[in-house]
């Protein structure tokens, strides 16, 4: 199949409405991210119980993310996104009505957990569409744009809009508003991706062959050592993103005296920064090398900015301007991991869907492990214990990066690759 050559600063123009759909859908999905843990606590539950709800959600998201790449190849990205879209809307309504509406912790866990299966199917299936419709040597910048629109949705609009709606319609009203955004994003995706192509050989596999391909999403972790190390680095990548969304509202609002709206604006500043840094690092990595950017700017940058996100607010107290400094730093350096999405399929060019599934599983496990670490450490070591744990893991990722041996299409690196031919780049 042919791939797209028309781009605008690395943005594939044939998929532009798919990018818009991701931004709109993730806006709705992101409404809850920075205030739901605090709201569950306000219903009468403990911080550990609030964190556990996010942990269960993250586990469901990890399982869904694991299968999404292969499922998208087998049934097409559009159909996989449809399943995720419908699942999200149905269980969001059940979560609001019977879970939060009745302050029933068991139903909160049940419906919120099941809803966790939805967004990875919608979000990560689009990565499959990108990989198969963009030239290999342009995939890093195209994926940089993917994470940029993700940040626009889940972080910027997903944080700023609630900061204005909560004072007027409250948390529950804001969560109902999220349904409108997700429905709109889902419809845009279904309409705009009617003619998006993916290789058809996967769709013609027998049932047994389909399950075998699905199983490869797990077996790659021990048949390809570079995939295993890449998976660990990808898990570590977004620990602070998902973890700070759970623990920092309690520190900023309950301890330092920030209002919920102020905290949401600090968190939105982090995501706003990633709009530009995702695109920036995606382009830079194609010139400098994927693994150099990930190691030196991603791992080291996140270790330092994670510490700053705790210590600067603790030192300056209720100071909105100073709280923005580590938020912006975090936004700059978390995006330096963007090339990881290109690394996985490059490591397994003949099984790109399975490789993307491992990438997605790793992203989902990050969503699961970040609050899980908080659940374990918060009762004993407070917020600082969680922050130090995240920092130590970023340092671990720094030492794992040299063990990942990837050939970057169109790029010559003494450390990691020999030159790729044009045919090899498209294999």
UniProtKB/Swiss-Prot annotation:
Domain of life assignment: Bacteria
Transmembrane segments: 8-28, 52-72, 80-100, 108-128, 142-162, 172-192, 239-259, 264-284, 296-316, 324-344, 361-381, 384-404
Gene: rbtT
Annotated compartments: Cell membrane
Source organism per UniProt: Klebsiella pneumoniae
Protein name in the entry: Ribitol transporter
GO cellular component terms, semicolon-separated: plasma membrane
Topology in the lipid bilayer: Multi-pass membrane protein
Family, per entry: Belongs to the major facilitator superfamily. Sugar transporter (TC 2.A.1.1) family. CsbX subfamily.
Pfam families listed in its UniProt record: MFS_1 (PF07690)
InterPro entries xrefs: MFS, MFS_dom, MFS_trans_sf, Polyol_permease-like, Sugar_transport-like
Cytoplasmic side: 1-7, 73-79, 129-141, 193-238, 285-295, 345-360, 405-427
CDD domains: MFS_CsbX
Single GO molecular function: transmembrane transporter activity
Database matches in PROSITE patterns: MFS
């Amino acid at each position: 199949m042919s791939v797209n050559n028309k781009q605008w600063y690395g943005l594939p123009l044939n998929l532009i409405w798919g990018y818009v759909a991701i931004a709109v859908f993730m806006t709705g999905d992101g409404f809850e991210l920075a205030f739901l843990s605090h709201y569950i606590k306000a219903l009468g539950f403990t911080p550990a119980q609030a964190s556990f709800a996010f942990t269960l959600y993250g586990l469901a998201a990890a399982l869904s993310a694991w299968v999404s790449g292969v499922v998208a190849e087998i049934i097409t990205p559009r159909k996989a996104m449809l399943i995720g879209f419908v699942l999200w809307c149905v269980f969001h309504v059940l979560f609001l009505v019977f879970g939060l509406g009745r302050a029933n912790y068991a139903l909160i866990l049940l419906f919120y957990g099941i809803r966790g299966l939805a967004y990875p199917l919608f979000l990560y299936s689009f990565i499959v569409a990108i990989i198969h419709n963009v030239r290999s040597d342009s995939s890093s910048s195209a994926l940089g744009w993917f994470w940029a629109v993700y940040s626009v949705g889940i972080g910027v609009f997903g944080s700023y809009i609630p900061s204005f709606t909560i004072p007027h319609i409250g948390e529950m009203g804001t969560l109902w508003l999220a349904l409108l955004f997700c429905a709109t994003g889902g419809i845009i995706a279904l309409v705009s991706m009617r003619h998006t192509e993916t290789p058809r050989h996967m769709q013609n596999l027998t049932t047994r062959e389909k399950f075998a391909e699905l199983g490869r999403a797990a077996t790659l972790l021990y048949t390809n050592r570079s995939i295993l190390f890449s998976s660990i680095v990808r898990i570590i990548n977004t620990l602070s993103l998902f973890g700070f969304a759970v623990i920092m509202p309690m520190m900023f609002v309950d301890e330092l005296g920030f209002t919920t709206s102020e905290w949401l604006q600090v968190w939105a500043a982090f995501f706003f920064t990633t709009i530009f840094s995702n695109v920036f690092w995606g382009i830079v990595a194609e010139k400098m090398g994927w693994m150099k950017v990930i190691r030196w700017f991603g791992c080291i940058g996140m270790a330092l900015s994670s510490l700053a996100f705790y210590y600067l607010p603790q030192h300056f107290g209720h100071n909105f301007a100073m709280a923005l400094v580590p938020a912006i730093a975090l936004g700059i350096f978390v995006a330096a991991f963007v090339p990881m999405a290109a690394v996985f399929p490059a490591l397994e060019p003949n099984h790109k869907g399975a490789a993307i599934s491992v990438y997605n599983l790793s992203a989902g496990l990050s969503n699961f492990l970040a609050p899980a670490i908080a659940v374990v450490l918060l009762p004993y070591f407070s917020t600082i214990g969680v922050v130090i744990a995240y920092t130590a893991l970023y340092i671990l990722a720094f030492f794992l990066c040299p063990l990942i041996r990837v050939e970057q299409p169109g790029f010559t690196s003494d450390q990691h690759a020999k030159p790729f031919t044009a045919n090899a780049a498209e294999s």
